[in-house]
Structures are given as structure tokens and as C-alpha cells.
Amino acid sequence: MCNQHQTRVLSVSHAKAKFEQTTIERRGLRPHDVLIDIKFSGICHSDIHSAFDEWGGGIFPMVPGHEIAGVVTAVGTKVTKLAVGDRVGVGCFVDSCGECEYCLNAEEQFCTKGVVQTYNSVDYDGNPTYGGYSQKIVVTDRFVVRIPDRLEMDVASPLLCAGITTYSPLKHWNVGPGKKVAIVGVGGLGHLAIQFAHAMGAEVTVLSRSMNKKEEALELGANHYFATSDPATFTALAGRFDVILNTVSANLDVDAYLSMLRIDGTLVSVGAPAKPDTYSVFSLIMGRRSIAGSLVGGIQETQEMLDFAAEHGIEPKIEVIGADQVDEAYERILRSDVRYRFVIDISTL
């Protein structure tokens, strides 16, 4: 192993602590490793859940960030598909066993040995992982994706989590021409889901609590928009959709949403509410309907998503901030005061 790489980071010392600038050591390059100078790091709501230890098991000090865009500055001796100067990205995971049925099927997120997360995780050597609120990161080459030239790096960073989180279920449930899909929520995830579903050729309906975001949703590619605060919405849309993609973290009236599915329709959730949802099993039985979830996507699919986004002009709406604004950004996210993703300019760190 070569010498370690010192890097400045933004870290929290304990749950709900303020961010501090400090220094850590990244591991030296192994044969299949890539050293990346990070240019931008997106802020995901998962970062807040983790930094506040709302899901438990937090590893502190913690360096969040799994929406990483940067440039390769060094490669290991056995790296053949990446070179110094390449524009690259790193998402939610940085390693997996590479041998189980799911890894071999390009679904590393379901690795039976346990996928290594980009931060708040432990690698196979027993060391804690630190994420993208950092100047540099060292990653196994097979977990690095290329950022297409048509995507600016700041815009690309949220796609590494928010983008693949919405693209993957739409693809898995065969959203495309002739399909009617509803997107629940017009936020960090929802505004990308609308664009992906539209580009895939589906008829897209947006479901949001109020009519406040109608104009934005239609501009993003929605064909229809309804407010779920109006009970008449559920009557008007009964039995309409092949797929409903729920992108919000609030608890829903699941039975009401299931009623809007066609026979064999599926309600897919990528938002994670703090409390369990409840529903009647008859809402499933009577229409042979399904409830499902989706966990980001594999590395091959993430690359496919980036290429698809570049080809179809799909971009997240972002607000670029400095390293000294992250605490404020967290507060603004919690009060829904962002359109729609914050991205940290790492040059300010």
C-alpha cells in the first residue's frame, strides 16, 4: 500500500453537532483503487438522518456525503478503465464482495456479505468510512462511474443518489410508452422522477398536497397534476395508474393511494417515513395490487442513468453553497426551503 492521503473534511463529532472543518487520512492506493479530487458533493436528506443519528447506529465522528463528483488524480496499478483527469462520480456505496449472486447480477446494493456504504459504515478491514464532504476520497474502481461531458459536475452530483433512486424503480417496473405513472411529491426526488418518467415516454401525473407546485411540475414534464388535500382527487383517479412512485418521507393514507392503481398495479416507495404505514390487506387482494420498495441501484445501472440523463437533458435543480453553509442548509431542508437540492462546492473547504 502506498502512503496515505491527508484531506480536509466537514465532520460532526456526535449526533446533531454542528459541522467542523478537520483533517483525516484516506488509505493509500491499492491496485484497484482510484484517488479522486472531489469538486462537488450533494446534500441528501439521508445525510441529515445519519448526522442526527435518527436511524440509530451512527458512527462518529462522521463525514456525510454520497453524491460525489470529482476528477481522478491517481490510479492503482491494476486500474485499466479509468485514467488521471477523468470526470467521475461516486454514489452510496464503495465496495461489495463481488462474488455473490447479486453482485454478479450488477445489484451490488443487495450484496449478501453486506455492501460497504460511502459513509457511516465499516469497510471489510474494519475501518469506518467517510463520505464526500471532503477534498479527496479513495474508492475501489468498480464503484466509480463516469460523468458524461454533457453534464456539469455540480449538476451531476445529486444524480448519484437522488437520480438513481428514482430511475431504478421506474425502469424495474417497466415505465414507458402506454403506461400511466403517478409521482407522489415534487421535492428532491420527485422533481427528478417526473423528468425520468416523462423521458421514458409514460403519461405522468403528479400528486402533491397542494396546487402550489403545479406550474413547476408541468414544466418538468408532468401531463397532469392533482392535489391530494382534495378528497375528490382519489375518486377521480380511482383505478388509473400502473405504477405510483412515492418519493416523500411523510406517512400516507396507503389504502387511498392503492385505490388509484389499476389491476396488477404497484405502489413503490423510495421515501422513508419515521413511523410505519398501515393498510388493509383487502386493498391489495381486491385488485391484485402490490406494495414495493426500491434501494437506489447497482453501479452499472447508475452509469446507465447518468448517460440517459445526459442524452435527455435531465438535470436536478440545485443551489450551490459553500462549506460554511452546510448547517444552515440542513435547517432549510428540514423546513422544505430548497428548490430542490443543495450541492457543496468543495473548493470552499
Swiss-Prot record:
InterPro entries: ADH-like_C, ADH-like_N, ADH_Zn_CS, CAD-like, GroES-like_sf, NAD(P)-bd_dom_sf, PKS_ER. It holds the Pfam family ADH_N. The keyword Metal-binding applies. Induction: By formaldehyde and methylgloxal, under the control of AdhR. Encoded in an operon with yraA. Zn(2+) 2 binds at residues 97, 100, 103, 111. Keywords: Metal-binding, Oxidoreductase, Stress response, Zinc. One of its GO terms (molecular function) is zinc ion binding. It comes from the Bacteria. Its EC number is 1.1.1.-. Zn(2+) 1 binds at residues 44, 66, 161. It is an enzyme of class 1 (oxidoreductase). Disruption phenotype: Cells lacking this gene show significantly reduced growth in the presence of formaldehyde but not methylglyoxal. Its cofactor is Zn(2+). The keyword Secreted does not apply. Binds 2 Zn(2+) ions per subunit. Functions in the protection against aldehyde-stress. Belongs to the zinc-containing alcohol dehydrogenase family. This is Probable formaldehyde dehydrogenase AdhA.
